[in-house]
Amino acid sequence: MKSVQFYEPKVIKCEDVPIKPPSEGEVVVKIMSALTCGTDVKTYRRGHPVLIKETPSGFGHEFSGVIDKLGKGVEGFKVGDRIVAANSAPCGKCFYCRHQEYNLCENLDLLNGAYAQYITVPARIVKKNMLILPSHLSFDKAAFCEPLANVVHGAYRTGIKEGQSVGIIGIGPIGLMFARVAKILGARVIVAGRNPIKLKAAEDFAHADEIIDLKKYPNPEKIFKEFSDEGKGLDVAIECVGLPEIWEQIFACVRKGGTVHFFGGCKSGSKVCFDTTKMHYGDIKMMSVFHHTPEYFRKALELISSGKIEVEKLITDTLPLEKVEYAMQQHIEGKAIKFLIKPWG
């Protein structure tokens, strides 16, 4: 099969590799649609200590497809089923799983290698995090389940409610999906970003109530507060960039009693500085949410299937496997939101 293999930072190759036969409980999926992702771009640029443990390695993790082969003992699926699979599944036995904190599982079974014609899905993911698609749902839309599951997890854990003012800095795919989910939950949403392609998507896809161009207004705190009820500050402020200075900036935008959600992960070892008086006496809730769980993976599929989230509007272009490196470069240059990768041309 054709597969994009990661060799080292900024060195990936589309080449022929063997299809891994399915072991007990596993399935081989013929990939019909895959998507580029910010994590993949970071991996392309500097590698990844978890996803890429040895090289060469498969690459990519957002996909949908058709079951091509079944391993021994697989139940609930058959060859020909149209499916979407997550890129992980919790063990259900470790300390965190016993506390129902499945996203923090110490033994997450991770899956990488979606930029390929076939992928072999581990047994635990087959059992816990692989879903059959509704007949009306396209492969292209279904491939968005994994990134949307992260956002739905974050939005529900944040407790976004109808009528609240929600502000988001950072409007890549995750920030845009956060804005759209917040709108579905009934919030009033203001977003801030720099990229003209993504600013347009904030209107066309997310349907944000107000959009700030940070090139024109680099310090959006005043605009965020003016957007809020009585100018007190946002009910919910969400950071989707992953820079310490933006963490500090978004903290300044929330009201007393509000919630700050730091969703964008900063570089390891980063430090931030907050006014502890404002945090303590303002009764401000500060939180972060990582990854997704089987529950939110299912919620993501439901949202996409319902048509409430028009994920296809986030696709910048459709490319073959041979153009994945080009896609990475386009992302680095800020010329795309997401690329749809079609392994079969």
Residue spans for each PLM region:
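Glycine-rich phosphate-binding loop and adjacent beta-alpha segment
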Residues: 241-306, 342-345
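N-terminal Rossmann-fold NAD(P) dinucleotide-binding loop
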Residues: 175-176
